[in-house]
């Protein structure tokens, strides 16, 4: 394949000397310092570095010499591009993209790759470029383009050294897209490949087992997991994850008998998983769920506490704790736990529903309504109709609560609206600890925080007293073994706001600290009800409203009437309106990751419901190759601010919405990036005018959904990562005039992408920095001004160069810059060197020694044959009414009308593909009796007739004979008979229909033909067409031109219809085929 760079005669020239030549004669640059230069040794070392080293190069070894060298090379390239005003060799940008990719600066790598793509016409010959571009798209979850780039690599270079990595990523992406057959194929290809890979064979086998689980082939998944456990020298972390998956599968799936039997299998698996990895917060959470389902509330609480201590705060865990408290008649403690859950994830529908149920049980309908409204607003809530009915009931009957006395309580949002956030509480503690060393400004801030803290305390005590006096029927709050008020004396509840906040590690709301200090439950605990699986097709209802011993409301039929249990409130994920890939997205995020975190796991039944909005797409698979401390752990991404559907989402299949098993070992994308980043996790402080650009990869975790799933984006990979004015301002530090503040690192922001005329611009938020506007980069009339920018520029403005556009950049005189010489690889065969008529001996000789794994080491493609690709979809897309236009119908009254030239022109006009002509037989005075069965038998009874049998199917579908898959070719079984035999069949079948006492009806009762009907069978037979009309009544016929059948390989119809009439017309009448469909 073509190398990433080209060898120039000026390669030996130092970068410093070249820069001096370019700067000669430019007085404005006399005062500037000389740019960095690369030595010969450094250029030789860089010559071996391209995208193929991604995941294998260790940047922090040897004193981080490799990372320093790559950073120096990037700065040199950026400086020279600025001086050359962007008019450099296209391979220069390819090398720059490789270096930025190895440094894991994905935004800059994408910009450089896009520039190379737009400048190099035969970019498809460069396999290293396609591989690097695919890695960047994979990082940004642009699976549509990543799949295309990786497939192009395998097409142009089947023996590519990183083919195993490509198969691995293709398997993950196809699993996300629910193409399980393709996913399994690529996982198996990766498994049998002996080349080095960032993932071990055991980890690939884990992905295959999880793929079965995602397909709900639980027995196959169980066998695959158990077979993996028998592997010798299985890494401890892989073993822990497999055991975790097996335990959670037994808990949720009906693999064995009743509940007690399932838990008897699930709990030992989870305990063994914790033996292999005691720090797995996810396994502790699953164990708590299992204990809770069988009534071991004390053990469940201990497991939940262990989960919180070993991982970041999880909304799922706190919601489950709230259910336990609510089950124990401790509404205040349950309230605090639910508030922790909704604070960590404001869109946690199950927590809002449980909180609404709690308020409803305490006769606070207005607060319950507000909680139900919040649950209904959540994008992960599927039972909105049930919630709407409940809200309507509460609104209509709220005045009748408590004997007609309506209660006026502050809603939960108001109770804690004055509370400090966990971050401010931590800051307050720090200021108090350093009170003696504070400056005047800090002392003033401390006074303000303490005054606000006092107001919060007063508000909290007032609200708690109100709930105690009016909110509980029986007066007594709970078992004396647990305090009724779990709020710390020093710290109030964390505030509940519309903007969800993420609790930082080590910083917990006050209710969290107090709830953890409550200890175990009393011995007389009531077991909690078993929660439904999220994948269940049953309607999932709200919990009991009889928690405190109150009488259940008979007017609420869908509420459970069990006064002893309070099942978890779940949302049903099997919504018919939800796309399958969105349901399965979190399950395909399995990647075994090297870090000190807990295992991920979960059943594919519990999958988070992802937003269907145009600007959200969850990062399903980790794109970086991550390594930490040289051993495997399965991380628990416990910040549930993404798309966790319910309080169970963190344990969804294969880690649920909160985790992803990273499939890579060697590389580390970012210290701050979680394994499965949530869509709003890293949006940053809105008050900051300039974000850390080097951490941009941690911010871009959203995609416009159409950019991933829609096939209507053409074949251009030009993601507009840098052409958004707001995002560009963020990258170059111009936001709020903070360019020269030093808060941003230097970034070479190249803009090769193009804008379209439609409104597909990049989202203004840095978390949605990928656009769908990607026409062909060769359309120079649609290009925006390309610029090369530097964040460390002494000027506050943008360095806009090459303002004339890319079209002029290639035609202009280019500065001869010294490129790093890359070792050449196999090249595309020139078309002139290939003979089109080789002998068999030459062919056999060429096929000998095909190379490794049966694949040739040299490419057999011609230099003018790019990889195949489907044609671009028409733009703009046609509306539905245009896809199925109304069919014109014309009625003929006489022969003159039939031969009217405008009628012929109308019928042959491409704008009218189908035309129905009525009254043709009468206008032409055709004697259809001449074509009756009797007449044909008398004329030529031995004439061979072809009979075809076709399947009944909708007009817009075409299935194969087995009915298992859609095909393009119209299948039709062919057989032959004679007119005499067909007449005999027709007569006998007609007699059978008469004996069956068939009742004739009007033509309006026509029914579609059943499967296996014969094209020439009698229309009046119930076992064929089932067209019910008197056989003696002639019918009207639809006239179809011959081309209407030939485009699917069908001959026009030529034989009998009902009543002995032949559905064919005279060729002299200008009709080539007549349909026997009665009208």
Curated annotation (Swiss-Prot):
A GO CC term assigned to this protein in UniProt: MLL3/4 complex
Protein name: Histone demethylase UTY
Subcellular location: Nucleus
Cofactor requirements of the protein: L-ascorbate; Fe(2+)
Region called Disordered, residue ranges: 558-694, 757-813
Biased composition (Polar residues): 558-601, 609-626, 647-656, 782-795
Modified residues (Phosphothreonine): 887
Family: Belongs to the UTX family.
Organism listed in the record: Pan troglodytes (Chimpanzee)
Subunit structure and binding partners: Interacts with TLE1 and TLE2.
Any one Gene Ontology BP term: heart development
InterPro entries on file: Corepressor-Demethylase, TPR-like_helical_dom_sf, TPR_rpt
Documented EC number(s): 1.14.11.68
Gene behind this protein: UTY
Biological classification of the source: Eukaryota, Metazoa, Chordata, Craniata, Vertebrata
């Amino acid at each position: 394949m073509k190398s990433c760079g080209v060898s120039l005669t000026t390669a030996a020239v130092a970068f410093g000397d070249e820069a001096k030549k370019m700067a000669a004669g430019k007085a404005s640059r006399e005062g500037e310092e000389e740019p960095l230069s690369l030595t010969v040794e450094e250029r030789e070392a860089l010559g071996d570095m391209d995208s193929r080293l991604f995941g294998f190069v260790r940047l922090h070894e040897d004193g981080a010499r490799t990372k320093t060298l790559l950073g120096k090379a990037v700065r040199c390239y950026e400086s020279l591009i600025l001086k050359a005003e962007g008019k450099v060799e296209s391979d220069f940008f390819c090398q720059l993209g490789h270096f930025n990719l190895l440094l894991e600066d994905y935004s800059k790598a994408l910009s450089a790759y896009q520039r190379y793509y737009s400048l190099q016409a035969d970019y498809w010959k460069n396999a290293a470029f396609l591989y690097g571009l695919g890695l960047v798209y994979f990082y940004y979850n642009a699976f549509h383009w990543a799949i295309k780039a990786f497939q192009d690599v395998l097409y142009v270079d089947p023996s590519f050294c990183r083919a195993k990595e490509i198969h691995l990523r293709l398997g993950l992406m196809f699993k996300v897209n629910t193409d399980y057959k393709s996913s399994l194929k690529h996982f198996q290809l990766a498994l049998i490949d002996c080349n080095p890979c960032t993932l071990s064979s055991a980890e690939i086998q884990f992905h295959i087992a999880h793929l079965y689980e995602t397909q709900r082939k639980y027995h196959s998944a169980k066998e695959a997991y158990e077979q993996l456990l028998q592997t010798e020298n299985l890494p401890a972390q892989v073993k822990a994850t497999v055991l975790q998956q097996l335990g959670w599968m037994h808990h949720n799936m009906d693999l064995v008998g009743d509940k007690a039997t399932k838990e008897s299998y699930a709990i030992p698996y989870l305990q063994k998983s914790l033996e292999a990895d005691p720090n797995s917060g996810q396994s502790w959470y699953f164990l708590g769920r299992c204990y809770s389902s069988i009534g071991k509330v004390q053990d469940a609480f201990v497991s939940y506490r262990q989960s919180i201590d070993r991982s970041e705060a999880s909304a799922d865990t706190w919601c489950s704790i709230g259910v336990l408290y609510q089950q124990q008649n401790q509404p205040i403690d349950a309230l605090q736990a639910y508030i922790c859950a909704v604070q960590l994830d404001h869109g946690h529908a199950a927590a809002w529903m449980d909180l609404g149920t709690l308020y409803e049980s305490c006769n606070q309908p207005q607060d319950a309504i507000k909680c139900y409204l919040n649950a209904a607003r959540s994008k992960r809530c599927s039972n909105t109709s049930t919630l709407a009915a409940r809200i309507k009931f509460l609104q209509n009957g709220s005045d009748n609560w408590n004997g007609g006395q309506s209660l006026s309580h502050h809603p939960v949002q108001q109770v804690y609206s004055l509370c400090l956030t966990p971050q401010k509480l931590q800051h307050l503690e720090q200021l108090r600890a350093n009170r003696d060393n504070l400056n005047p400004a800090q002392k003033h801030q401390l006074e303000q925080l303490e005054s606000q803290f006092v107001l919060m305390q007063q508000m909290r005590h007032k609200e708690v007293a109100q709930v105690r006096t009016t909110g509980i029927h029986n007066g007594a709050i709970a078992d004396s073994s647990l305090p009724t008020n779990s709020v710390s004396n020093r710290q109030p509840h964390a505030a509940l706001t519309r903007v969800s906040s993420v609790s930082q590690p080590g910083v917990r709301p006050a209710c969290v600290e107090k709830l953890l200090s409550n200890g175990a439950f009393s011995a007389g605990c009531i077991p909690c009800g078993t929660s439904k699986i999220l994948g269940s097709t049953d309607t999932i209802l709200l919990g009991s409203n009889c928690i405190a011993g109150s009488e259940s409301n008979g007017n609420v039929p869908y509420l459970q009437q069990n006064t002893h249990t309070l099942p978890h409130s779940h949302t049903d994920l099997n919504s018919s309106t939800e796309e399958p890939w969105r349901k399965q997205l979190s399950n395909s995020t399995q990647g075994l990751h090297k870090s000190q975190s807990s295992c991920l796991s979960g059943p594919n039944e519990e999958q988070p419901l992802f937003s269907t909005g145009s600007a959200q797409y969850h990062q399903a698979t980790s794109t970086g190759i991550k390594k930490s401390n040289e051993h495997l752990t399965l991380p628990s991404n416990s910040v549930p601010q993404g798309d966790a559907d319910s309080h169970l989402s963190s344990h969804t299949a294969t880690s649920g919405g909160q985790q992803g098993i990273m499939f890579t070992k060697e590389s580390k994308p970012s210290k701050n990036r979680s394994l499965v980043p949530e869509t709003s996790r890293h949006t940053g402080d809105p008050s900051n005018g300039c974000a850390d650009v080097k951490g941009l990869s941690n911010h871009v975790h959203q995609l416009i959904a159409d950019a991933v799933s829609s096939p209507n984006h053409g074949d251009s990979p030009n993601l507009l990562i840098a052409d958004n004015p707001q995002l560009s301002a963020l990258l170059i530090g111009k936001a709020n005039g903070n360019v020269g503040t030093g808060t941003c690192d230097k970034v070479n922001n190249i803009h090769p992408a193009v804008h379209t005329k439609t409104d597909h611009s990049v989202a203004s938020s840095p978390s949605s920095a990928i656009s769908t506007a990607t026409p062909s980069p060769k359309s120079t009339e649609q290009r925006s001004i390309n610029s090369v920018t530097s964040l460390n520029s002494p000027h506050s403005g943008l360095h806009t160069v090459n303002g004339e556009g890319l079209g002029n950049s290639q035609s202009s005189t280019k500065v001869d810059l010294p490129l790093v010489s890359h070792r050449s690889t196999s090249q595309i065969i020139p078309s002139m060197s290939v003979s089109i008529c080789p002998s068999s001996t030459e062919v056999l000789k060429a096929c000998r020694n095909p190379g490794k794994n049966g694949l040739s080491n040299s490419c057999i493609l011609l230099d003018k044959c790019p990889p195949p690709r489907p044609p671009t979809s028409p733009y703009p897309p046609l509306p539905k009414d245009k896809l199925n236009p109304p069919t014109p119908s014309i009625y003929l009254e006489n022969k003159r009308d039939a031969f009217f030239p405008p009628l012929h022109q109308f019928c042959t006009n491409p704008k009218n593909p189908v035309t129905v002509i009525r009254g043709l037989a009468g206008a032409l005075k055709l004697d259809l009796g001449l074509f009756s069965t009797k007449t044909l038998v008398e004329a030529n009874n031995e004439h061979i007739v072809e009979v075809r049998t076709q399947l009944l199917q909708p007009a817009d579908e075409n299935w194969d004979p087995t009915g298992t898959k859609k095909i393009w070719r119209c299948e039709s079984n062919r057989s032959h008979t004679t007119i005499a035999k067909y007449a005999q069949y027709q007569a006998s079948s007609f007699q059978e229909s008469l004996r069956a006492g068939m009742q004739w009806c009007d033509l309006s009762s026509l029914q579609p033909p059943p499967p296996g009907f014969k094209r020439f069978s009698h229309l009046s037979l119930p076992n064929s067409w089932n067209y019910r009309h008197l056989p003696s009544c002639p019918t009207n016929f639809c006239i179809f031109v011959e081309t209407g059948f030939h485009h699917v390989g069908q001959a026009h119809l030529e034989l009998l219809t009902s009543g002995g009439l032949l559905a064919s017309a005279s060729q002299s009448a200008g009709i080539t085929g007549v349909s026997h469909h009665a009208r």
